[in-house]
Amino acid sequence: FWKDVYGVDMSVMTPTVMKEPLVDYVNKDMIMSDSCKILDIDLVTCKKEDVNFSSKYSLKMRYNDRVHGLVAWFDTAFSRLTHPTVLSTSPYRTGTHWKQTVLYLE
């Protein structure tokens, strides 16, 4: 991607961009695959060691193109409330200040 940004070689930016995830709003139309859950945590009962995890996942691509990164978001269910609700940071929902996290691939 960085070798041809609208005809300009921006590859000098690659090390800086790859260093840390980008927290920003992601347009749902930019997502090339189905989504999948990688972790389910009960925040009422979880322990410190529960957040150190690995997860196998599979993504089904909707069309053939180059993948530049992975997009992460979370959904939090407040199911014990009088009126249960879900806070979703998905790019398919109304935006929140939490945004999404982009993990760029080399």
Label each PLM-derived region with a short phrase.
Residues 1-106:
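Class I SAM-binding transferase module
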